[in-house]
Amino acid sequence: MFGSPFRPAWVNPDGMQVKAVILAGGRGSRLAEETEVRPKPMVTIGGMPILWHIMKIFSAHGVNEFVICLGYKGYIIKEYFANYFLHNSNVTFDLKANKMQVHENEAEPWKVTLIDTGEDSQTGGRLLRVEKYLDGDEAFCFTYGDGVGDVDISALVTFHKAHGKLATVTAVRPPGRFGTMSLDGDTVSEFREKQVGPGSYINGGFFILSNKIFDYIENDATIWEDKPLRTLSSEGNLVAFRHEGYWQPMDTLRERQLLEEYWQSGEAPWKVW
């Protein structure tokens, strides 16, 4: 069976469970060979969607409630979870008797809410559309559906609660081609997309956000990484959680192959469960 023993959802000091919101609506144009037939988060690593790997990372730290932001080919993600036990269990079909027997059901302790956030909504717009499904939670996790890492989610949540600002972003050191953040201590003093230099930190996703961040998002056209993050940064309300461990996005076929090779080696760095 995949996974570790059941862990209850991470509970903040006020007794509320922390949910994880995952963006899963993009088209993944640089993975066209894979994403013509499925949404990018359903591209597989080791036979399992990268979305599943991301959820396992959170679940390893006790975060078991998820809100998934659907868009492009979102029905495929709905069908995957509707038939999750079939995808991950051995079954016997007795066609004559019209019966099905499930063997060794590979269940997860997850509650998954799947929300259509629009075919063409931007990242901020997708986040805004799921606000009402967070039940007014004081804080929640938020990340992209195409990147994995050995991020310590428990430490990340604790860090966010300690500094008291509105947003925490996981800052990572990547291979090139990403935007950068200037750090003043842990505070993000400037946020710039698509400008990277040697030794820079970038936005690695794995955010912890206060529900007050919805005041910074205007509509479906709002790009989360643009005005909202820049405004939070200029106000001193965006704090960086420095992650010096493994982090890898899956934006190209080459990166997918890299992740697949790690998984097949039995030494996938993001496998923290």
What are these regions (language model features)?
Residues 10-83, 114:
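N-terminal glycine-rich phosphate-binding loop and ensuing alpha1 helix
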Residues 20-22, 68, 142, 167-170, ...:
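Structural beta-sheet core signal
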Residues 6, 77-185:
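Conserved beta-loop-beta/alpha segment of the NTase-like Rossmann-fold superfamily
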Residues 53, 126-129, 228:
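Well-ordered alpha-helical segments embedded in enzymatic catalytic cores
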Residues 138-143, 148-161, 173-176, 187-273:
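Catalytic-core segments of class I nucleotidyltransferases/pyrophosphorylases
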